[in-house]
């Protein structure tokens, strides 16, 4: 697996859009915030164009995080498949923190070969006024992010939405290690 670390939103967005525009089979996009600004529209248009080329497109976005975004922005044409993660979850009423959480992940997987993960939401603000360290994975490590998306999609899809095939877990040998901001433990 080839790993690329980004430090600027403009750079990672350019690469993400390039991957979407080069997709041949399937795109899996999961995001927390997706602004209806020029950059958000560029992502939306790239997904629509991919779908028109015959690429399967699956999108998950968080309903609560996008309350200020006009819902018409998320009216993506069929056959794009969309899950709007619910604004209110059952755990809120029962004061169960584990069942009231948000979908805060930001994942893009293209053709099961290229994956991006990090903290950037989709929006022009994040391109120039935000700092994060997203990563692009090209190769077998992208499968882990694909599997994470597939599991989430299948657990949250409506009955009229397609069930994504679960390819099963694969052996993954991590080359990067994430650790808390404290002494690492082995």
Tell what function each PLM region has.
Residues 1-186:
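Charged, low-complexity intrinsically disordered terminal segments
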